[in-house]
């Protein structure tokens, strides 16, 4: 029902199967022997391990699932009826080490904004900012068409200001903006809107995207190619 929910058949009727498209996926690991992701469709620029550590089977599950939903093969030996949305697309996978969600909701601290754009008492995000800048530089330099990001930080975007976000992530924003690249050629960044629904019993308002997926709400230069997405149930209702 998922393919029907996104009207995939209309795209297929126009010949849009993912052919000649590369999907970037950043996640904790990928089983590159999985039947859904044929080795011939996995970019040689992929990085399947991190910090000289190879992800274990558990760490590969989520990334393998995401890759299968995005680009799982149409034709395969076991004739399973499942296939990915863009079943002819290539995949460039970058594995990064991800932490387990905290049991308690703990929104990230971006310091204090005095209302005039001046930020104080902010933690040092230089290392994290450099990391994301270098990560997105990989996709941009390789002209990857679209990138899936199923990770992030706790904290509703409406609880932050433009000044706070720019202060914490200047290089990330610059890389995502892709200045000098025509809109039609920019890499599109797709984000899971967030996992705050898991903290509903703690009174968290989860009706807004979290920090990274919601960044385009505050940063004009990444609007149009940074997208927050949600999951829905079979009735079309946004999942909890």
Q: Residue ranges of each PLM-predicted region?
A:
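Residue-level detector of conserved, well-ordered beta-strand and adjacent loop positions
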Residues: 38, 43-44, 51, 213-216, ...
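Subtilisin-like serine protease catalytic core
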Residues: 9-46, 53-127, 140-145, 156, ...
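Short, solvent-exposed secondary-structure capping/transition elements
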Residues: 4-5, 79, 133
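Solvent-exposed, polar/charged alpha-helical surfaces in well-ordered, non-transmembrane soluble domains
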Residues: 9, 23, 64-68, 133, ...
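Short coil-to-helix leader/linker segments, especially the first N-terminal amphipathic alpha-helix
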Residues: 1-9
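Soluble or luminal CAZymes and related metallo-dependent hydrolases
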Residues: 3, 123-131, 164-169
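Substrate-binding/specificity loop regions of serine endopeptidase catalytic domains
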Residues: 82, 152-240
């Amino acid at each position: 029902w998922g393919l029907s929910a996104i009207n995939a058949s209309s795209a297929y009727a126009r010949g849009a199967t993912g052919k000649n498209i590369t999907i970037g996926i950043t996640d904790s690991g990928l089983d590159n022997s999985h039947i859904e992701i044929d080795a011939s469709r996995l970019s040689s620029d992929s990085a399947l391990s991190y910090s000289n550590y190879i992800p274990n089977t558990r760490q590969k599950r989520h990334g393998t699932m995401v890759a299968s939903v995005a680009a799982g093969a149409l034709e395969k030996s076991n004739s399973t009826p499942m296939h990915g949305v863009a079943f002819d697309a290539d995949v460039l996978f970058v594995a990064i080490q991800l932490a387990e969600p905290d049991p308690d909701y703990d929104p990230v601290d971006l310091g204090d904004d005095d209302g005039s754009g001046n930020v104080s008492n902010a933690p040092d995000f230089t290392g994290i900012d450099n990391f994301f800048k270098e990560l997105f530089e990989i996709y941009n330099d390789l002209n990857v068409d679209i990138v899936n990001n199923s990770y992030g930080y706790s904290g509703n975007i409406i609880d932050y200001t433009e000044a706070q976000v720019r202060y914490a992530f200047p290089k990330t924003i610059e890389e995502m903006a892709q200045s000098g690249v025509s809109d039609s050629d920019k890499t599109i960044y797709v984000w899971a809107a967030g996992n705050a629904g898991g903290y509903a019993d703690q009174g968290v308002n989860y009706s807004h995207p979290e920090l990274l997926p919601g960044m385009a709400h505050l940063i004009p230069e990444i609007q149009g190619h940074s997208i927050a997405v949600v999951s829905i149930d079979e009735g079309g209702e946004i999942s909890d």
